Swiss-Prot record:
It comes from Agrostis stolonifera. GO terms for biological process: aerobic respiration; photosynthesis, light reaction. The keyword Transferase does not apply. The chain crosses the membrane at residues 29-49, 103-123, 128-148, 164-184, 202-222, 247-267, 303-323, 335-355. Belongs to the complex I subunit 1 family. NDH is composed of at least 16 different subunits, 5 of which are encoded in the nucleus. It is found in: Plastid, Chloroplast thylakoid membrane. Keywords: Chloroplast, Membrane, NAD, NADP, Plastid, Plastoquinone, Quinone, Thylakoid, Translocase, Transmembrane, Transmembrane helix. It holds the Pfam family NADHdh. It catalyses: a plastoquinone + NADH + (n+1) H(+)(in) = a plastoquinol + NAD(+) + n H(+)(out); a plastoquinone + NADPH + (n+1) H(+)(in) = a plastoquinol + NADP(+) + n H(+)(out). Its EC number is 7.1.1.-. GO terms for molecular function: NADH dehydrogenase activity; oxidoreductase activity, acting on NAD(P)H, quinone or similar compound as acceptor; quinone binding. This is NAD(P)H-quinone oxidoreductase subunit 1, chloroplastic.
Length: 362
Protein backbone atom coordinates (compact mmCIF):
# COMPACT_ATOMS: atom_id res chain seq x y z
CA UNK A 1 0.00 0.00 0.00
CA UNK A 2 2.91 2.34 0.75
CA UNK A 3 4.37 1.75 -2.71
CA UNK A 4 1.00 2.40 -4.32
CA UNK A 5 0.62 5.65 -2.38
CA UNK A 6 4.10 6.81 -3.42
CA UNK A 7 3.37 5.97 -7.04
CA UNK A 8 0.09 7.89 -6.91
CA UNK A 9 1.82 10.95 -5.41
CA UNK A 10 4.53 10.76 -8.07
CA UNK A 11 1.95 10.58 -10.85
CA UNK A 12 0.06 13.53 -9.36
CA UNK A 13 3.24 15.60 -9.14
CA UNK A 14 4.07 14.85 -12.77
CA UNK A 15 0.54 15.77 -13.85
CA UNK A 16 0.80 19.07 -11.95
CA UNK A 17 4.16 19.72 -13.60
CA UNK A 18 2.69 19.11 -17.06
CA UNK A 19 -0.22 21.40 -16.22
CA UNK A 20 2.19 24.13 -15.12
CA UNK A 21 4.13 23.73 -18.38
CA UNK A 22 0.93 24.15 -20.39
CA UNK A 23 -0.07 27.23 -18.39
CA UNK A 24 3.42 28.71 -18.81
CA UNK A 25 3.27 28.02 -22.54
CA UNK A 26 -0.05 29.84 -22.82
CA UNK A 27 1.28 32.78 -20.81
CA UNK A 28 4.44 32.96 -22.96
CA UNK A 29 2.45 33.32 -26.21
CA UNK A 30 0.06 35.88 -24.70
CA UNK A 31 2.23 38.91 -25.72
CA UNK A 32 2.42 37.57 -29.29
CA UNK A 33 -1.35 37.09 -29.47
CA UNK A 34 -1.87 40.57 -28.03
CA UNK A 35 0.48 42.05 -30.64
CA UNK A 36 -1.30 40.21 -33.47
CA UNK A 37 -4.66 41.50 -32.23
CA UNK A 38 -3.25 45.03 -32.05
CA UNK A 39 -1.79 44.75 -35.57
CA UNK A 40 -5.15 43.56 -36.93
CA UNK A 41 -6.98 46.49 -35.34
CA UNK A 42 -4.35 48.94 -36.60
CA UNK A 43 -4.67 47.66 -40.18
CA UNK A 44 -8.45 48.06 -40.04
CA UNK A 45 -8.04 51.60 -38.72
CA UNK A 46 -5.51 52.47 -41.45
CA UNK A 47 -7.83 51.18 -44.19
CA UNK A 48 -10.69 53.25 -42.77
CA UNK A 49 -8.49 56.34 -42.42
CA UNK A 50 -7.22 56.06 -45.98
CA UNK A 51 -10.73 55.85 -47.35
CA UNK A 52 -11.91 58.80 -45.29
CA UNK A 53 -8.88 60.97 -46.13
CA UNK A 54 -9.10 60.01 -49.81
CA UNK A 55 -12.78 60.93 -49.87
CA UNK A 56 -12.04 64.28 -48.22
CA UNK A 57 -9.27 65.07 -50.72
CA UNK A 58 -11.51 64.17 -53.67
CA UNK A 59 -14.53 65.98 -52.15
CA UNK A 60 -16.77 62.93 -52.06
CA UNK A 61 -18.51 60.81 -49.43
CA UNK A 62 -16.45 57.93 -48.09
CA UNK A 63 -17.70 54.71 -46.47
CA UNK A 64 -20.69 55.43 -44.26
CA UNK A 65 -23.16 52.52 -44.44
CA UNK A 66 -21.20 49.59 -42.92
CA UNK A 67 -21.36 50.40 -39.23
CA UNK A 68 -21.10 53.83 -37.59
CA UNK A 69 -19.04 56.20 -39.78
CA UNK A 70 -18.24 53.24 -42.05
CA UNK A 71 -15.92 51.67 -39.47
CA UNK A 72 -16.99 48.13 -40.40
CA UNK A 73 -16.37 48.56 -44.14
CA UNK A 74 -12.90 47.01 -43.97
CA UNK A 75 -14.26 44.01 -42.05
CA UNK A 76 -16.99 43.58 -44.67
CA UNK A 77 -14.45 43.68 -47.51
CA UNK A 78 -12.18 41.21 -45.73
CA UNK A 79 -15.07 38.81 -45.14
CA UNK A 80 -16.01 39.03 -48.81
CA UNK A 81 -12.44 38.13 -49.87
CA UNK A 82 -12.36 35.17 -47.48
CA UNK A 83 -15.59 33.77 -48.94
CA UNK A 84 -14.57 34.17 -52.59
CA UNK A 85 -13.33 31.24 -54.65
CA UNK A 86 -9.57 30.66 -54.67
CA UNK A 87 -8.81 30.27 -58.39
CA UNK A 88 -5.50 28.68 -59.40
CA UNK A 89 -3.86 29.23 -62.83
CA UNK A 90 -4.08 26.04 -64.88
CA UNK A 91 -0.56 26.36 -66.31
CA UNK A 92 1.09 28.06 -63.37
CA UNK A 93 3.47 26.74 -60.74
CA UNK A 94 0.92 26.01 -58.01
CA UNK A 95 3.34 25.49 -55.05
CA UNK A 96 5.15 28.78 -55.71
CA UNK A 97 1.83 30.47 -56.47
CA UNK A 98 0.54 29.49 -53.02
CA UNK A 99 3.75 30.18 -51.08
CA UNK A 100 4.40 33.67 -52.50
CA UNK A 101 1.75 35.61 -50.50
CA UNK A 102 2.62 33.75 -47.29
CA UNK A 103 6.32 34.66 -47.56
CA UNK A 104 5.46 38.33 -48.05
CA UNK A 105 3.09 38.43 -45.04
CA UNK A 106 5.32 36.46 -42.65
CA UNK A 107 8.43 38.53 -43.44
CA UNK A 108 6.61 41.76 -42.60
CA UNK A 109 4.97 40.36 -39.46
CA UNK A 110 8.41 39.32 -38.16
CA UNK A 111 9.49 42.97 -38.38
CA UNK A 112 7.19 43.79 -35.44
CA UNK A 113 9.46 41.73 -33.16
CA UNK A 114 12.01 44.56 -32.88
CA UNK A 115 9.66 47.58 -32.86
CA UNK A 116 9.37 49.20 -29.39
CA UNK A 117 5.79 50.43 -29.16
CA UNK A 118 6.20 51.80 -25.64
CA UNK A 119 8.65 52.07 -22.78
CA UNK A 120 10.54 48.75 -23.09
CA UNK A 121 7.41 47.25 -24.66
CA UNK A 122 9.17 45.19 -27.33
CA UNK A 123 9.12 41.46 -27.99
CA UNK A 124 12.83 41.19 -28.81
CA UNK A 125 15.28 43.91 -27.74
CA UNK A 126 18.21 42.76 -29.87
CA UNK A 127 21.57 44.48 -30.27
CA UNK A 128 21.14 44.23 -34.07
CA UNK A 129 17.45 45.16 -34.10
CA UNK A 130 17.40 47.65 -37.00
CA UNK A 131 19.58 45.48 -39.21
CA UNK A 132 17.44 42.45 -38.46
CA UNK A 133 14.48 44.48 -39.71
CA UNK A 134 16.32 45.32 -42.94
CA UNK A 135 17.28 41.66 -43.43
CA UNK A 136 13.73 40.45 -42.80
CA UNK A 137 12.12 43.10 -45.01
CA UNK A 138 14.41 42.06 -47.87
CA UNK A 139 12.65 38.68 -47.96
CA UNK A 140 9.25 40.13 -48.95
CA UNK A 141 10.24 40.95 -52.59
CA UNK A 142 11.22 37.30 -53.03
CA UNK A 143 7.60 36.34 -52.34
CA UNK A 144 6.39 38.95 -54.83
CA UNK A 145 8.80 37.69 -57.49
CA UNK A 146 7.67 34.11 -56.85
CA UNK A 147 4.05 35.22 -57.21
CA UNK A 148 4.77 36.92 -60.53
CA UNK A 149 6.82 34.05 -61.94
CA UNK A 150 4.43 31.27 -60.90
CA UNK A 151 1.32 32.93 -62.37
CA UNK A 152 2.33 32.15 -65.98
CA UNK A 153 1.16 35.61 -66.98
CA UNK A 154 3.26 38.27 -68.67
CA UNK A 155 1.72 41.09 -66.64
CA UNK A 156 2.32 39.23 -63.38
CA UNK A 157 5.90 38.41 -64.33
CA UNK A 158 6.68 42.01 -65.25
CA UNK A 159 5.13 43.15 -61.97
CA UNK A 160 7.31 40.71 -60.01
CA UNK A 161 10.44 41.91 -61.80
CA UNK A 162 9.53 45.53 -61.12
CA UNK A 163 8.96 44.76 -57.43
CA UNK A 164 12.39 43.12 -57.14
CA UNK A 165 14.16 45.93 -59.01
CA UNK A 166 12.41 48.61 -56.97
CA UNK A 167 13.23 46.91 -53.67
CA UNK A 168 16.93 46.56 -54.54
CA UNK A 169 17.12 50.19 -55.71
CA UNK A 170 15.73 51.67 -52.50
CA UNK A 171 16.94 49.14 -49.92
CA UNK A 172 20.53 50.40 -50.16
CA UNK A 173 19.82 54.12 -49.46
CA UNK A 174 17.51 53.08 -46.63
CA UNK A 175 20.28 50.92 -45.13
CA UNK A 176 22.77 53.80 -45.30
CA UNK A 177 20.30 56.03 -43.42
CA UNK A 178 19.89 53.38 -40.72
CA UNK A 179 23.69 53.07 -40.45
CA UNK A 180 23.97 56.82 -39.84
CA UNK A 181 21.36 56.60 -37.06
CA UNK A 182 23.24 53.68 -35.48
CA UNK A 183 26.46 55.70 -35.49
CA UNK A 184 24.75 58.65 -33.79
CA UNK A 185 23.16 56.41 -31.15
CA UNK A 186 26.20 54.14 -30.69
CA UNK A 187 23.83 51.19 -30.92
CA UNK A 188 21.77 49.16 -33.37
CA UNK A 189 19.10 48.33 -30.80
CA UNK A 190 15.78 50.03 -31.47
CA UNK A 191 15.26 50.62 -27.74
CA UNK A 192 18.70 52.24 -27.36
CA UNK A 193 18.05 54.46 -30.39
CA UNK A 194 14.83 55.77 -28.84
CA UNK A 195 16.45 56.34 -25.44
CA UNK A 196 19.37 58.20 -27.08
CA UNK A 197 16.84 60.74 -28.41
CA UNK A 198 15.25 61.37 -25.00
CA UNK A 199 18.07 63.44 -23.46
CA UNK A 200 17.23 66.81 -25.02
CA UNK A 201 13.51 66.45 -25.61
CA UNK A 202 12.12 67.70 -28.91
CA UNK A 203 15.50 68.96 -30.16
CA UNK A 204 17.14 65.63 -29.43
CA UNK A 205 15.13 63.82 -32.08
CA UNK A 206 17.16 62.50 -34.99
CA UNK A 207 15.01 64.38 -37.48
CA UNK A 208 16.97 67.54 -36.52
CA UNK A 209 20.35 65.80 -36.38
CA UNK A 210 19.75 63.91 -39.64
CA UNK A 211 17.40 66.01 -41.82
CA UNK A 212 18.89 64.74 -45.09
CA UNK A 213 18.79 61.16 -43.88
CA UNK A 214 15.17 61.63 -42.80
CA UNK A 215 14.09 62.78 -46.27
CA UNK A 216 15.94 59.91 -47.95
CA UNK A 217 14.48 57.42 -45.47
CA UNK A 218 10.98 58.85 -46.02
CA UNK A 219 11.20 58.53 -49.81
CA UNK A 220 12.79 55.07 -49.63
CA UNK A 221 10.10 53.88 -47.22
CA UNK A 222 7.34 54.99 -49.58
CA UNK A 223 9.09 53.18 -52.42
CA UNK A 224 9.44 50.03 -50.31
CA UNK A 225 5.70 50.18 -49.57
CA UNK A 226 5.00 50.47 -53.33
CA UNK A 227 2.71 53.42 -52.76
CA UNK A 228 1.98 56.13 -55.28
CA UNK A 229 3.99 57.62 -56.89
CA UNK A 230 6.07 54.42 -56.60
CA UNK A 231 3.42 51.76 -57.33
CA UNK A 232 5.05 50.61 -60.58
CA UNK A 233 4.83 46.85 -59.76
CA UNK A 234 1.01 47.00 -59.84
CA UNK A 235 0.31 49.90 -62.21
CA UNK A 236 -3.25 49.34 -63.42
CA UNK A 237 -2.84 51.15 -66.75
CA UNK A 238 0.22 49.10 -67.71
CA UNK A 239 0.10 45.73 -65.92
CA UNK A 240 -3.59 45.24 -65.00
CA UNK A 241 -2.69 44.45 -61.35
CA UNK A 242 0.96 43.40 -61.64
CA UNK A 243 1.95 40.32 -59.69
CA UNK A 244 -1.58 40.19 -58.20
CA UNK A 245 -3.33 39.75 -61.56
CA UNK A 246 -4.03 36.00 -61.26
CA UNK A 247 -4.85 36.03 -57.54
CA UNK A 248 -8.29 35.90 -55.99
CA UNK A 249 -9.94 35.17 -52.66
CA UNK A 250 -7.82 34.89 -49.55
CA UNK A 251 -4.49 35.01 -51.44
CA UNK A 252 -5.42 38.35 -52.97
CA UNK A 253 -6.47 39.46 -49.50
CA UNK A 254 -3.00 38.59 -48.20
CA UNK A 255 -1.38 40.87 -50.78
CA UNK A 256 -3.85 43.58 -49.80
CA UNK A 257 -2.81 43.03 -46.19
CA UNK A 258 0.90 43.17 -47.10
CA UNK A 259 0.65 46.71 -48.47
CA UNK A 260 -0.93 48.07 -45.28
CA UNK A 261 1.32 46.06 -42.96
CA UNK A 262 4.33 47.43 -44.83
CA UNK A 263 2.98 50.95 -44.46
CA UNK A 264 2.42 50.44 -40.73
CA UNK A 265 5.94 49.04 -40.21
CA UNK A 266 7.50 51.92 -42.14
CA UNK A 267 5.51 54.46 -40.11
CA UNK A 268 6.61 52.90 -36.83
CA UNK A 269 10.27 52.82 -37.89
CA UNK A 270 10.13 56.48 -38.94
CA UNK A 271 8.81 57.18 -35.45
CA UNK A 272 11.44 55.05 -33.71
CA UNK A 273 14.45 56.22 -35.71
CA UNK A 274 13.66 59.92 -36.22
CA UNK A 275 10.75 61.09 -34.05
CA UNK A 276 11.83 59.93 -30.61
CA UNK A 277 9.61 56.86 -30.32
CA UNK A 278 7.55 56.90 -27.13
CA UNK A 279 9.21 60.08 -25.77
CA UNK A 280 7.38 63.38 -25.38
CA UNK A 281 8.64 66.60 -26.95
CA UNK A 282 9.59 68.14 -23.59
CA UNK A 283 12.99 67.47 -21.96
CA UNK A 284 12.92 64.04 -20.43
CA UNK A 285 11.49 64.31 -16.93
CA UNK A 286 9.18 61.39 -16.34
CA UNK A 287 5.94 62.26 -14.59
CA UNK A 288 5.92 58.79 -13.10
CA UNK A 289 9.22 59.35 -11.27
CA UNK A 290 7.25 61.24 -8.61
CA UNK A 291 5.34 58.09 -7.70
CA UNK A 292 6.43 54.83 -6.20
CA UNK A 293 6.98 52.41 -9.07
CA UNK A 294 4.51 49.54 -9.07
CA UNK A 295 2.73 47.40 -11.63
CA UNK A 296 -0.16 49.83 -12.12
CA UNK A 297 2.15 52.81 -12.71
CA UNK A 298 4.33 50.74 -15.05
CA UNK A 299 1.33 49.65 -17.11
CA UNK A 300 0.05 53.25 -17.28
CA UNK A 301 3.45 54.54 -18.41
CA UNK A 302 3.66 51.83 -21.07
CA UNK A 303 0.13 52.62 -22.28
CA UNK A 304 0.91 56.33 -22.62
CA UNK A 305 4.12 55.45 -24.49
CA UNK A 306 2.16 53.29 -26.94
CA UNK A 307 -0.32 56.14 -27.50
CA UNK A 308 2.52 58.61 -28.21
CA UNK A 309 4.23 56.19 -30.61
CA UNK A 310 1.05 55.53 -32.57
CA UNK A 311 0.19 59.24 -32.71
CA UNK A 312 3.55 59.98 -34.34
CA UNK A 313 3.16 57.01 -36.68
CA UNK A 314 -0.22 58.31 -37.85
CA UNK A 315 1.49 61.55 -38.90
CA UNK A 316 3.58 59.59 -41.41
CA UNK A 317 0.48 57.66 -42.47
CA UNK A 318 -1.34 60.92 -43.18
CA UNK A 319 1.61 62.17 -45.26
CA UNK A 320 1.79 58.95 -47.29
CA UNK A 321 -1.97 58.90 -47.93
CA UNK A 322 -1.92 62.56 -49.00
CA UNK A 323 1.02 61.94 -51.34
CA UNK A 324 -0.84 59.03 -52.91
CA UNK A 325 -3.69 61.27 -54.03
CA UNK A 326 -1.51 64.26 -54.92
CA UNK A 327 1.43 63.12 -57.06
CA UNK A 328 1.24 61.23 -60.38
CA UNK A 329 2.92 57.88 -60.94
CA UNK A 330 6.55 57.91 -62.05
CA UNK A 331 7.91 56.02 -65.03
CA UNK A 332 10.13 53.00 -64.37
CA UNK A 333 13.27 54.75 -65.65
CA UNK A 334 12.52 57.78 -63.46
CA UNK A 335 12.06 55.55 -60.43
CA UNK A 336 15.38 53.77 -60.97
CA UNK A 337 17.21 57.02 -61.71
CA UNK A 338 15.88 58.54 -58.49
CA UNK A 339 17.10 55.56 -56.48
CA UNK A 340 20.53 55.00 -58.03
CA UNK A 341 21.55 58.49 -59.21
CA UNK A 342 20.14 60.67 -56.43
CA UNK A 343 19.17 58.87 -53.23
CA UNK A 344 22.13 56.48 -53.17
CA UNK A 345 24.85 59.20 -53.50
CA UNK A 346 23.01 61.49 -51.06
CA UNK A 347 22.61 58.74 -48.44
CA UNK A 348 26.25 57.69 -48.86
CA UNK A 349 27.43 61.28 -48.45
CA UNK A 350 25.23 61.65 -45.37
CA UNK A 351 26.76 58.49 -43.90
CA UNK A 352 30.31 59.76 -44.55
CA UNK A 353 29.50 63.12 -42.93
CA UNK A 354 28.01 61.38 -39.90
CA UNK A 355 31.04 59.11 -39.59
CA UNK A 356 33.42 62.09 -39.83
CA UNK A 357 31.52 64.06 -37.18
CA UNK A 358 31.53 61.08 -34.83
CA UNK A 359 35.28 60.59 -35.30
CA UNK A 360 35.96 64.28 -34.64
CA UNK A 361 33.87 64.20 -31.45
CA UNK A 362 35.90 61.32 -29.99
Amino acid sequence: MIIDRVEVETINSFSKLELLKEVYGLISILPILTLLLGITIEVLVIVWLEREISASIQQRIGPEYAGPLGLLQAIADGTKLLLKEDILPSRGDIPLFSIGPSIAVISILLSFLVIPLGYHFVLADLSIGVFLWIAISSIAPIGLLMAGYSSNNKYSFLGGLRAAAQSISYEIPLTFCVLAISLLSNSSSTVDIVEAQSKYGFFGWNIWRQPIGFLVFLISSLAECERLPFDLPEAEEELVAGYQTEYSGIKYGLFYLVSYLNLLVSSLFVTVLYLGGWNLSIPYISFFDFFQMNNAVGILEMTIGIFITLTKAYLFLFISITIRWTLPRMRMDQLLNLGWKFLLPISLGNLLLTTSSQLVSL
